[in-house]
Amino acid sequence: MDYIKQIKKIQKQQIDPVYFLHGTQAFIIEEMINEVLANTLSKDEQDMNVQRFRLADTPLQLIIEEAETLPFFSSKKVVIIQDFYLATSQKNDTSIDHQIESLEPYLKQPLPETVLIIIAPYEKLDERKKVTKQLKTNTTVVHAAELSEHETIKWIGEQANQLGIDVADPVKKRLVELAGTNLLQLRSELTKCQLYSGVGGEVTMEAVNQLVAKTLEQSIFDLIEWSMKGEISAAVANFKEMVRRKEEPLMILAMLVRQLRIYLHVKELKQRSYSEKQMVGMLKLHPYVVKLAAKQVVSFDEKKLKSSIMAAADTDYAIKTGKQEKEFAVELFIIKLGALSTREYA
């Protein structure tokens, strides 16, 4: 896992002059920045020797000039560019004139006293751009992307070691099932578990089930599975619990439809012998989402899935035309999902 290797290098004081962090996983980006700061400057030095810039506010050439300036009463300084959209196809409304050519000579010969961190918190880079190629060639690149299930389990182990708690592999997997793969959320849940078990303690399956709240996505998974299996009482109870948590019924309906469509797509691709890896690329979904869907669709009939999506459209229409109150309408739709599970098709 690329970023964990870089974290370990930084903690050994092996700090590179320029880092290029790109991707949407905010926790990875923040942890990289925090580790660089902690292992480069003392708290007192950080006040005078950490500069943060946004391209939307400051010309790139001025940021490079700052990077080329010696630190103030310190052996090191850190310069951070927060939103490097120049490496993407994203348009920006700013009228600031960026001299992109000022970056190349600096990347080839960075100031030894400066650590430059360039952040592109976007899903995709524009690989055709010269600046993107320069960054990928002349910097230490860390892709802050969603982790696979295996990588997430490994990451939980690293975080558990830092927190001084013991988490067995089955408990790690349960944690991911409940909290999802968002690292910020997982770190928060692990911290909660540490407070419960104490430093040096073991986090049990019972503790995770008791302490960790399901994500909305996981609740949707469970709700559909219970409904399609005819376990209506459990499905309705799940829905009412989501409403008690202040989840908007229309949002729940939208997510139900999204999940049903994912199931339908995965079902069709599975029948055509596509692998889960191929499905991830085609559907642009997280590998963990595809893995769960592939496991669940085994017991789902394709015609029932299509009928369920049509029933959801009818429910949405009834709500938006004022024919049915939204909470009642979504609950009725969940009951209909259960009815579909018992219907036979020729």
Task: Cite the ranges covered by each PLM segment.
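Conserved beta/loop motifs at nucleotide-recognition and modification sites
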Residues: 1-346
